[in-house]
Amino acid sequence: MTTRKRQIKNFTLNFGPQHPAAHGVLRLVLEMNGEVVERAEPHIGLLHRGTEKLIEYKTYLQALPYFDRLDYVSMMAQEHAYSLAVEKLLNCEVPLRAQYIRVLFCEITRILNHLLALTTHAMDVGALTPFLWAFEEREKLLEFYERVSGARMHASFIRPGGVAQDLPLGLCRDIDSFTQQFASRIDELEEMLTGNRIWKQRLVDIGTVTAQQAKDWGFSGVMLRGSGVCWDLRRAAPYDVYDQLDFDVPVGTRGDCYDRYCIRIEEMRQSLRIIVQCLNQMPSGMIKADDRKLCPPSRCRMKLSMESLIHHFELYTEGFSVPASSTYTAVEAPKGEFGVFLVSNGSNRPYRCKIRAPGFAHLQGLDFMSKHHMLADVVTIIGTQDIVFGEVDR
């Protein structure tokens, strides 16, 4: 009896959904030719929680915490988008101090996001040290979150009409101290990675995206700017006080993983510039809109007046009504253009809330980005896309 040996080169590989480099619950079905990827098919929906439908059963204020839990790495940026959408429907003007506080914390959020994105990406590729060093800095930023909202992550701090409460005493001083030492932490991160021979071998010319491909696939944020397209909503369509602040928009040339890494590093430096300007320019004044149908009375007034207590109770149970209309409002979140399409029918609950998550578009491009690359490069490409499945699956 003769045995015949056959060499199999073409096979299908299941990557995830419990793979440590999958950044959550990603399941990839990879068609392989030896070690080379011929096709990558993402299977999404494993973290679907029906957020958009749940929002329809909540008041406008009760819907806000859902946005913290979409991309759970850049929380306040999403609160910001939703709050701006509600304010646009209400034609509400936010006090200048509240606008500066919002921008301050959105840039803190950007640094939080990029620190995690860069260092987990490095860990996927094989560099462990940056991850441990960066988490020390993230801890300081999460402490700032905790001091303004009481929560380290899901803050619900940016609200329609302003912010939940004013900055506590000493916080601005501590944020200023952080900005003075953080630039040298970025330098340390760059010393480990930017010129590292192995890091460059794993990232240069991997996952290349041309400017036209980025536009065709609906990429935004770092994924778009890495391909040489200078598009940043903070510049192109400024919101709050971004038009009064001075910062640069870093743009790549080759559109590969290394360019996107360099852009995220530079964006952290630009966020530091914005934070310092916010601290220096922040005026005194109110932190909520002077609209009693939208913003609750202060705690001290509630303790003195029964009417104020009733007013507070009404706002948090019944909520406020929004005129029948619709709006699409987008912000430059750390991962790209995060948009909210909000439809009101004149009641105290949203009729429809469609969420435009940047990671959803980026994940669809994984197939063409990883085609004819090695299996190990797929991990690099997922890392450079900075995917979080809370916002992809919603």
UniProtKB/Swiss-Prot annotation:
Cellular location(s): Mitochondrion
GO MF annotation: an example: NAD binding
GO process terms (BP): mitochondrial electron transport, NADH to ubiquinone
Keywords: Electron transport, Mitochondrion, NAD, Oxidoreductase, Respiratory chain, Translocase, Transport, Ubiquinone
Key word Translocase present: yes
UniProt cross-references to InterPro entries, sorted A to Z: NADH_Q_OxRdtase_suD, NADH_UbQ_OxRdtase_49kDa_CS, NDH1_su_D/H, NiFe-Hase_large
UniProt keyword annotation of NAD present: yes
Reaction catalysis annotation: a ubiquinone + NADH + 5 H(+)(in) = a ubiquinol + NAD(+) + 4 H(+)(out)
Any Gene Ontology CC annotation: respiratory chain complex I
A Pfam cross-reference name: Complex1_49kDa
Subunit structure: Complex I is composed of at least 49 different subunits. This is a component of the iron-sulfur (IP) fragment of the enzyme.
Family: Belongs to the complex I 49 kDa subunit family.
Name assigned to this protein: NADH dehydrogenase [ubiquinone] iron-sulfur protein 2
Species the sequence originates in: Arabidopsis thaliana (Mouse-ear cress)
